[in-house]
Amino acid sequence: MSANKDAILLRINKEDQVKALNELGFSEITFETPLSEIAEYIRWAGGLRDIRLACVKISDGSLVYFTGEEWVALSTNSKSQYSKLGVCIRARRREFIIAATDCTNSSGGYTFKFGGGGTDFKNVKNYGAGNTGLYEVETGYEDTKAIIEQTAGKTDSYSTTGAPAAEAAWNYKANAYDTMQWYLPSITELRLMCEFKDEINDFLTKYFLGGTFANEWYWSSTEHDSSSSWYVGMGYGGSYYGGRTNAGRVRPVCCSVVSSAE
């Protein structure tokens, strides 16, 4: 949704607001929903709603979210009951958790080849340049899983074994309490992270003391063709398809499960 459409949605009557939000996929919105909450959803539809801490409650493994203000207000003893996973972003109708750091390779570096060169992955859609659906890709988890399964134990024609980038994301763990299944983000999720990079970086700096995005290329799980996949340059925000022998960074994401802070 554009900024202009967002502004128009704020000005129309409540019945039309509810109808428009329902059409965008927010089926939980009804005429009984408070206007203040509807305004939050309108912001979510058209831009950045919020960024929150995603934490695991150590006692039962449940996933809990805190705003920055809520986290600061907790006592030291209360904070010790939770283990931080990453940051949860809600923007442009989407919600997912972003790891608090990039993956590292076996040498301690931060870049990975994609792997699978020459393979047109089955059940993974190709998005050629100019494809109108490129920025509505919702299959990051499924595509990561398929890429790993189809490259397992195989060495491509460029001497890369497996799918290093996808495997790094899939095997990522934030800490000993982390039971989430992380994956290589879709091009849509990665572009969203790039769009709100400054806000995410500020949040990471404040609540994780680091882990900000580098101004380098990051791999997505979205395929271009049998020899290339999509990545995003965090330095200038461009999306491009690159050969799978290229090196790129990996920032895992995972699906969010809504839970209220206690």
Task: Mark where each language-model region is.
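Helix N-cap / beta->alpha transition motif
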Residues: 10-13, 139-141, 186
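Extracellular/lumenal glycan-associated surfaces
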Residues: 15-25, 94-101, 181, 187, ...
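Short, compositionally biased
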Residues: 47-178, 244, 251-262
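Surface-exposed patches in mature extracellular/periplasmic domains of secreted proteins
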Residues: 29-31, 177-185
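C-terminal, surface-exposed recognition/capping segments
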Residues: 162, 172, 180, 187-262
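Surface-exposed receptor/substrate recognition regions of extracellular proteins
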Residues: 1-52
